[in-house]
């Protein structure tokens, strides 16, 4: 009688156990089992606030929108509600981008001066002049302070400067080409996902916070959604399209504004019924 080493028996048992587990896994994987998955905070916020992350179908991006704050748009004497696109939802946080360009401002006041987002005049204008003109004190309190990461220009290596903490800011090249936010992932090409209208009803150039090819230039998006890396910093013909993070739990300060799509279509919300009965004639 040939003796079998104990190690062989253990190894054989191990191989048998592994084989049995593989067979069980194959059997289980052939069925679609109902599994209870707890909702994430993002999913809960989407259902509780009625807002969703951007969706892309057949190359067309659709964003949910809200009204929040008021600013001069169609004229310089009357403020109108600001419409924002929802770029992302995470719990009670909504990352918002203005649906259209809201103003024309230079990135910096001194031409050909080395500048970054941290030191530019537009950052000050957004967080002082615009913030105070567009939002009430309660609305300002609902806007979250955001740690803004200022990366170098990946194409040219231009210095992006130090990170900042802002309530209102501009998108970066990386954010304006982030498909999770509904944008075309290729920055240097035409894209309807990046087209923004001016208040006069024409598509315009809008500024980003990222540096351009040189330290005295800034990145921007043109009227057909193409990304540029050499905008003049003191030019006052480029538009401002603000971004911010809103605390959605301040629900009395904002309201749903329907949906917009990159193909130009607009889906307005259904008006809420009034409690006042219609007159009978």
Residue spans for each PLM region:
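Signal peptide processing junction and immediate N-terminal pro/mature segment
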Residues: 32-43
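Residues marking helix boundaries in flexible regions
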Residues: 5, 23-24, 38, 144, ...
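Collagenous Gly-X-Y triple-helix signature in extracellular proteins
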Residues: 44-281
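Sec-dependent signal peptide recognition
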Residues: 15-23
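Hydrophobic core
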Residues: 22-30
